[in-house]
Amino acid sequence: MRIKMVSLEDGTISCGFRKIAAFTARINPDTESYYITTKRYASLRNVLFGSHGIGVVDADAIDEIAQGLKDADLIGFSSMTGYADITRRVIHRVRELRPDVLMVWGGIHPIIEPENAITADVDAICTGEGEFAFEQFLSLAKEGRDYTKVENFWFKRGEDVIRNGFLPLMTTAQMESLPFPQYGEKEKIYREGKGFEPMAFADYVVHGGQDYSTLWSIGCPFRCSYCGNTKFIENDPNYTKIRHPSARYIVDEVKSVRQRFPHISHVSFHDDSFMAIPYKQLEEFAELWHEEVRVPFTVYGVIPNYVRRDKIEILTWAGMNRIRMGVQSGSEAILEFYQRPTPPEKIREATEIIAEFTPKYHVAPSYDIIMDNPVETRQDVIDTLELVYAMPRPYTLIIFSLKVIPNTGLAKEMLKRGIDLEQIDASYLQIPPRMANILLYLLGTWCPPRWLFDQLLKRVEASTTPQPLYPRIGLLFRFLFFGKKVINHLKFMDFSLMPGWISYYAYRIGLIDFWQRRVIKRMPRPEPPKRAFSPDVAPVIATDAVRH
């Protein structure tokens, strides 16, 4: 059976898609992967001016995409809610060209909004973890047998919808058995006016630079109402448990990628809750990474409640050079509204621990802040600004304008309150130039004296209060803010946030290699772990380095 797997998003990171694509290629060798990118972050102008939003794909491009997909026997689509409309249009056009082709829609959107996704011109949607459910579905489809009882799927039969339940979540052993995520194997990318072409080395550089993005763990112990994970937890409460393959598995995955792409000299872990992984597993990971990989890595998705000095220390010793932690708000009332059990005092405690390692060992940490919540009062906004002002420096901020994901707890609560929700396809990085938001850009760049900060606070209002906008001042402070962020990274020769040729040429001329082999070795590092005093640590389980 000829299968085409299709990812639609901003770029080509697609961590989850790469996993299911690799698994599908294992069970069905005649499988190819296709990437349709909106390129909304490809422009420096978009970043500086905040003019993001979902990329526009016109009718001619939709037709060209569909023409390139139509000759498959089965097409599997993957997209988030922000790209649901584009996905739906592609599916519809493929159906016009090939009424008999089997089409399945997976990814985040069908899980969060299955009732919406099933109305597309598809035969099925995947509503849970896809790997082993898809294997069952594909086996039955190839044999011409009834597949409509396969769990983790909904199926359409004429006007009827068959809504099946869920398989148990993958076990650690099952995760260990999966092939490594697909990267550089039978992948194609859409180029406007040319259709799909094999991904060239330049595509990996343009979209990723010298960084490789991956996931080690799945799951999140929190039920934050704004997050799509709440739907995963609603479907199976066990999603609050952190699951992951062995440390050997993730280290060998990265080694496998670096063997084929030697320019990869930084790794980003996009786990939802990396720091919630038990210390013993982190220690095992750290020793393997320090011994066998020896390149810097960044940990995203850090939750304040799980920040511990010993975990930060062991990961820093291994090579962690940056942390990104979710703060979201400094208002206890708003954190409770988000159902996020991270009180401001816990946030302050976490930032103080992280500050012990910055800038001695780390690039300035990034802290996520959510603004423009219509429920916030003026005092809630001030509480957030006060918390950010008091956090130990250096740090940088990642500022989001609240966008509500449909069918989440937050969406339901907002609707109860009669709040008119903005469309999800408005980017959460489009930050209105209100005084509160401008102050965040200022705080991410410079710590003003207290008297000046107090004066500026007097101009702050809740986002729903009519107030003047300052687009020119906002642009100035955005420019300074991003300039400071670039400087912070260049101090550590960290190009992980700079996809494109700049980071590649830094690798080619030997700058990154010189820095990592000569300079970092001489920089102070925490003491290595003393495994002799940790007899209860589980032994490393050896696995094959190549998983096809």
Model-assigned labels for residue ranges:
Residues 2, 9, 23, 32-33, ...:
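Glycine-rich beta-alpha loop elements in corrinoid/cobalamin-binding modules
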Residues 12-19:
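Short N-terminal binding/cap micro-motifs at the start of the first secondary-structure element
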Residues 42, 114, 222, 333, ...:
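Flexible glycine/acidic-rich beta-alpha junction loops that bind and position SAM and/or redox cofactors
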Residues 114-120, 312, 374-390:
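Catalytic cores of alpha/beta
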